[in-house]
Amino acid sequence: MAKIVVTGGQALQGEVNISGAKNAVLPILCATLLADAPVQISNVPHLHDVITMVKLLSELGAEVTIDEGTLAKGRSILVDPRSVTHQIAPYELVKTMRASILVLGPLLARYGTAEVSLPGGCAIGSRPVDQHIKGLQALGAEISVENGYIKATSHGRLKGGRYVFDMVSVTGTENVLMAAVLAEGTTVLENAAMEPEVTDLADCMIALGAQIEGAGTPRIVVQGVQRLGGGHHAVLPDRIETGTFLVAAAMTGGSVTVRRARPETLDAMLDKLTEAGATITTTADSITLDMQGKRPRAVSLTTAPYPAFPTDMQAQFMALNCVADGVGVINETIFENRFMHVNELLRLGADIQVEGHTAIVRGAARLSGAPVMATDLRASASLILAGLVADGDTTIDRIYHLDRGYENIEEKLGALGATIQRTA
């Protein structure tokens, strides 16, 4: 099984291009099922989850053509949904990636029927699908859960309605939003997720002919249309990858510019990096972080839905706090079981105390390399970050988690001066 070996001690310097956002491209690929003509998606990252989603679309009968492109420009995917013949997303594919549930709304809206296996693909606690089910029922769907599958049908077109999400759910918002686009009449979604990836999904569907207002706010209004046509959409940059490289620069006392970024989607993260002592300058599509000659200061944070601090950056900032000056308190309010990286960071010499959903991190003068094991996507990133500043070699096992969400991370870090390699 492949591993990554990191040798610590190098301050990162240089520039890095940010890839398309994993959490945007997956729902956007699902949204192509709503169209009745080919849809081209560009700036698609080279990720394992994207490959899985392409397999799922192909399993449903869609014709998918991939232009591999380059690391510099990203890949392009052309989806022709006119050949879709199946409306069942099988367990074999769904179990490896939770985002597979996002075909439920499009299949139901377009074909009046959908069967999607209950999802797997993530070890960071329960992520209930009830928000998806309730939202689709509010549009007139009949839904049952039988034999491990969500089975949804509608008699004729879905009907527009008003739905208030019990809790903020990104994928729940996306699933119901996609279904509402082809529903008859007006749909109002309240307490909707405001993440930039939701806005990007809406922008894609608007380009195909959807009528959506309010994406990026808690209230989204959709005027249903009869059909979506073909078109093109470029995926927005990945704000979590952006944040990960900025934290790497801060931890190593480096100076890094991230290009093809969207600074306006990173306010909470940039505020915390400034609090940690970094000097940050931004342009419309780049961010430069300078921490040369300085040790980061510890920061305290609480994860919450956008625009607050993202749970997907919690592990990386914990790694920063492990070598920072002072004590940082991290409260995780989004997911349970999202401190699984703590035991691995402890193996490197970190000083972390966990009490329920709170981690208290006391900065250590140094970490020392050791063999560690990745437990989920963002945890694996935090271990690489810790390895960048640890004495000696840090060997990270189970890096298949990493390939689900980071495109060529060892190449990108290596280009910034890190000593990092993938081994068989």
Curated annotation (Swiss-Prot):
Annotated binding of phosphoenolpyruvate, by residue: K22, N23
Catalysed reactions listed for this entry: phosphoenolpyruvate + UDP-N-acetyl-alpha-D-glucosamine = UDP-N-acetyl-3-O-(1-carboxyvinyl)-alpha-D-glucosamine + phosphate
Domain of life: Bacteria
Cellular component annotations (GO), alphabetically ordered: cytoplasm
KW Cell wall biogenesis/degradation (keyword) present: yes
Xref: Pfam families: EPSP_synthase
UniProt entry keywords in alphabetical sequence: Cell cycle, Cell division, Cell shape, Cell wall biogenesis/degradation, Cytoplasm, Peptidoglycan synthesis, Pyruvate, Transferase
Residues at which UDP-N-acetyl-alpha-D-glucosamine binds: R98, R127, P128, V129, D130, Q131, D312, I334
Catalytic residues (positions): C122
EC top class, as a word: transferase
Modified residues (2-(S-cysteinyl)pyruvic acid O-phosphothioketal): C122
UniProt-annotated location(s): Cytoplasm
Gene3D superfamilies: Enolpyruvate transferase domain (3.65.10.10)
EC numbers: 2.5.1.7
One BP annotation, GO: peptidoglycan biosynthetic process
Pathway: Cell wall biogenesis; peptidoglycan biosynthesis
Transmembrane segments: none
GO molecular function: UDP-N-acetylglucosamine 1-carboxyvinyltransferase activity
Record function comment: Cell wall formation. Adds enolpyruvyl to UDP-N-acetylglucosamine.
Protein family: Belongs to the EPSP synthase family. MurA subfamily.
The name this protein goes by in its record: UDP-N-acetylglucosamine 1-carboxyvinyltransferase
Species classification: Bacteria, Pseudomonadati, Pseudomonadota, Gammaproteobacteria, Lysobacterales
